[in-house]
A protein has these predicted regions:
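Short, ordered loop/turn segments at secondary-structure junctions
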Residues: 42, 81, 110, 165, ...
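Histidine/acidic residue-rich metal-binding segments in metalloenzymes
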Residues: 90, 142-214
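Metal-cofactor-binding active-site regions of metalloenzymes
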Residues: 42-50, 99-134
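Hydrophobic faces of well-ordered beta-strands that scaffold small-molecule active sites
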Residues: 29-35, 76-78, 105-109, 160-162, ...
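Metal-associated gating/positioning segment near the N- to mid-region
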Residues: 24-99, 115, 185, 213-214
Length: 214
């Protein structure tokens, strides 16, 4: 099972499998509150959305989940699928259905960003820019933001991920603070919609006004 029922000496159960760990040190399962099972080492130089199929990326995510479990983490919060479509959802569901052993996973699916923001691929020729798959859902107005959250809920995510700022590459050159990608009103719109569906919202925020808005 997944629940500790009793702790003590001389406990007996007719149905339990007994494992002698008297010479071992036993720890409770660890929890990783922010990880990315779809993120691979080659990500920064070659965005996998451009050359890897989502099927292949799902297999990579399976491998990552197994490695995480072997490291002692029995629960993880996967924050953004890195443009791998429903790979994180597939891995979570396969584990929950007993298809293979892995950690308990809570997933956000696609993150939500803006045009020109973090996870929106830049530097592409205008003729192909709109045709290339992105690393996140790009939403520039309240209608698109609400629709994105509803689509994510329909897909079966556990919570919503938004990009309130970019990375340290997107900073104010005078204050060195991360640039805010979303207004307070935009953040509130998405939080309100997520709450309607009983979902939490995780915000990528390196600091500055973006973090305050979140």
């Amino acid at each position: 099972g997944n629940r500790i029922v009793k702790v003590g000496k001389s406990l007996k159960s007719n149905s339990a499998t007994v494992i002698d760990l008297s010479d071992k040190t036993v720890l409770p399962g660890l929890i990783d509150g922010h990880t990315h099972i779809c993120l691979t080492p080659d990500y920064s130089s070659n965005p996998p959305v451009l050359y890897k199929t989502n099927t292949y990326r799902t297999m990579e995510a399976f491998k990552a989940a197994k490695r995480i479990l072997n490291a002692g983490f029995t629960t993880i919060r996967d924050v953004d699928n890195e443009g791998a479509d429903m790979a994180d959802i597939a891995v979570r569901d396969a584990i929950n259905e007993g298809m293979f052993v892995g950690p308990r996973i809570f997933v956000s699916g696609w993150a939500i960003s803006i045009t020109g923001g973090h996870m929106n691929l830049t530097g592409l020729r205008p003729s192909i820019d709109k045709k290339v798959e992105q690393l996140a859902i790009i939403a520039d107005n309240s209608e698109d933001m609400v629709a994105a959250i509803r689509d994510q809920r329909k897909s079966g995510v556990d919570f919503i991920k938004i990009y309130a700022t970019g990375t340290l590459r997107h900073i104010n050159r005078e204050t060195l603070e991360p640039l805010s990608q979303l207004s307070t009103e935009e953040v509130q719109i998405m939080v309100n919609e997520a709450r309607r569906w009983d979902m939490d919202v995780a915000a990528h925020a390196y600091g500055g006004t973006g973090a305050l808005h979140a």
